[in-house]
Amino acid sequence: MKKKRVILAYSGGLDTSIIVRWLTEKGYEVITYTADVGQGEELSEIPEKARRAGAIEAIVEDLKETFAENYCLPTLRALALYEGKYPLTAALSRPLIAERLVYYAEKFNADYVAHGSTGKGNDQVRFELSVWALNPDIEVLAPVREWEFKSREEQVEYAQRFNIPVKATKEKPYSIDRNLWGVSIECGPLEDPWQEPPQDAYQITQSPEEAPDEPEYVTVGFEKGKPVYLNGERYEEQWKLIANLNEIAGRHGVGRIDMVENRLVGIKSREIYEAPGAMVLYEAYRDLLSLVLDRFTFHYFLTHIPHEYAKLVYEGLWFTPLREALDAFTNKIAEFATGEVRLKLYKGSVSVVGRRSPNSLYVEELATYSEKDQFDQIAGKHFTKVWGLPLKVLGRVRKGK
């Protein structure tokens, strides 16, 4: 009898490592798929780890530039932060991975694709909605939703029993998801929202207390909304600029986020994120937009786009006309976003200290209070009178006049 074939989204972490063995014991033929979206050095161990766990084949694909160009950049252009804080580090990679799972399922005639998401997490929605949008006939398996393990400690014991190497231990039971855009960390002592995160939970950022005592200045250059220069050096590959900025900002403790967020399934979850490069780029791009956009467009953009874009990414709606429409809007805005932004990094903080653009709408002669002032202040008097007319009428009515 022919075995059922499944393409598994494989990170090499605790959950997906034991999923390989678990599916194999259930009679599945497992092919693992790993997208290199900037996980770092750990990726070199992935194929051997997958085969040791029972996979018949392990696919690793370099998608760093695809991830940077087609996922990180559009999200940056939207200034998307879920609930005003989370830069969507893990969430952004899910539709890309799902797209490749579908590709390889079709290529290898697999009956199923599988992921390692839990029944109370967000990723189950992101993976499955993306797969269905691309190929509604493919069935999705989620072993974590139905297997027998009740705790992370039991999973660690299972992995140790089958000699499956994983980083998680009973002493350090973190679940870590890392890519080019940042790191997501949860579980273990982090589940108590009152307790400060242990320093060993952080992966790519220095503790602000131990960061350099001198600030470091960086300059990010944009061309039509795309960061292409870092400190005067041009980057033809977007992922390399982000990676270098991660290293620079990370050593200054920039980009640490500790938040309680609202998951899709209705629960609140304490999450730790590290996104040094992303947070520097967000700060820089927002400031550049404030320089080059008129007030009406800038205010509309800030009021609507960041929230709506973050929401659709978080909720697994990447492959929708809504996302395409919002991309069209942000791409139009980006046509004006050429210029440089200078930022100061110091002990966990990032602040803009300078900006310039050939499309700048800042006119010094209108803004200055010096003798160069060209603003017609008499016009200001009449403007104020017209602008305040509704309140003047309101005041008269309330006073009965």
Curated annotation (Swiss-Prot):
UniProt similarity note: Belongs to the argininosuccinate synthase family. Type 1 subfamily.
A single cellular component GO annotation: cytoplasm
Subcellular location: Cytoplasm
Keywords of the record: Amino-acid biosynthesis, Arginine biosynthesis, ATP-binding, Cytoplasm, Ligase, Nucleotide-binding
Class in the EC hierarchy, top level: ligase
Keyword Transcription in annotation: no
Primary location group: cytoplasm
EC number: 6.3.4.5
Example GO molecular function: ATP binding
Pfam families, alphabetized: Arginosuc_syn_C (PF20979), Arginosuc_synth (PF00764)
Entries under NCBIfam families matching the protein: argG, PRK00509.1
HAMAP family the record matches: Arg_succ_synth_type1 (MF_00005)
Gene: argG
Pathway: Amino-acid biosynthesis; L-arginine biosynthesis; L-arginine from L-ornithine and carbamoyl phosphate: step 2/3
Catalytic activity: L-citrulline + L-aspartate + ATP = 2-(N(omega)-L-arginino)succinate + AMP + diphosphate + H(+)
Assembly behavior: Homotetramer.
GO biological process, one term: L-arginine biosynthetic process
Sites where the protein binds ATP: 9-17, 35, 116
InterPro entries noted in UniProt: Arginosuc_syn_C, Arginosuc_syn_N, Arginosuc_synth, Arginosuc_synth_CS, Arginosuc_synth_type_1_subfam, AS_cat/multimer_dom_body, Rossmann-like_a/b/a_fold
Binding site for L-aspartate: 118, 122-123
Residues reported to bind L-citrulline: 86, 122, 126, 175, 184, 261, 273
Name of the featured protein: Argininosuccinate synthase
